[in-house]
Amino acid sequence: MKLNISFPATGCQKLIEVDDERKLRTFYEKRMATEVAADALGEEWKGYVVRISGGNDKQGFPMKQGVLTHGRVRLLLSKGHSCYRPRRTGERKRKSVRGCIVDANLSVLNLVIVKKGEKDIPGLTDTTVPRRLGPKRASRIRKLFNLSKEDDVRQYVVRKPLNKDGKKPRTKAPKIQRLVTPRVLQHKRRRIALKKQRTKKNKEEAAEYAKLLAKRMKEAKEKRQEQIAKRRRLSSLRASTSKSESSQK
């Protein structure tokens, strides 16, 4: 089995092949996201703790978190699921995925170093791969340089050098996202003011409508009562005329 081990602190990754079954037994029957001591891999791994982040079986099917089985299952996957990338909007597809429990049928197991041990691993912990781009979000720039809210983030943006042959060297900086400026605060105040204005207008319109509705209902009630009174008068008039006619006979 191959072990694809990464160390986020240095940005390095290393693929090692382990033929000895006894060294791998420590990972068997463990689930994804479990932290395991890597002492069994050899003397240089003493003190290291790794997290199982995934893997692929011998046919190339990936492990999926949450599928509690050793074998392969076919799941209906949609946008947002791991192990699937939709090609069309709203597309769903039934795909074969492997369970999240590690066993001997895997060809590659992905591990992430959580805790560094006593010794350095050549090509993994002794070298550092510099990041190609710096942070873009304002809060992340603050976190990187340990800045307070009063400090100006724009001065600390990591600039990317653009060196072309025969041209003047220049640098390029990303646009800072979520940067709080007076203009942003003004926009926020305007949004809140407009919202309050809309609420006030809606309340006034609702009150006006309720007033008009009450007026119309009162008019309709008066009209109905008038009609009822008219009918009663007519019926009483008919009754009195029929009585007088019968008495005359």
Swiss-Prot record:
Family matches, as Pfam families: Ribosomal_S6e
Residue ranges, compositional bias (Basic and acidic residues): 217-229
UniProt keyword annotation of ATP-binding present: no
| InterPro entries assigned | Ribosomal_eS6, Ribosomal_eS6-like, Ribosomal_eS6_CS
Name positions with the PTM Phosphoserine: S148, S235, S236, S240, S242, S244, S247
PTM N6-acetyllysine: at which residues? K211
Record's Gene Ontology CC terms? cytosolic small ribosomal subunit; nucleolus; nucleus; perinuclear region of cytoplasm; small-subunit processome
Keywords, A to Z, come to: Acetylation, ADP-ribosylation, Cytoplasm, Hydroxylation, Isopeptide bond, Nucleus, Phosphoprotein, Ribonucleoprotein, Ribosomal protein, Ubl conjugation
| Reported function | Component of the 40S small ribosomal subunit. Plays an important role in controlling cell growth and proliferation through the selective translation of particular classes of mRNA. Part of the small subunit (SSU) processome, first precursor of the small eukaryotic ribosomal subunit.
Tell me the protein family, please. Belongs to the eukaryotic ribosomal protein eS6 family.
Protein's recorded name: Small ribosomal subunit protein eS6
Tell me the gene name.
Answer: RPS6
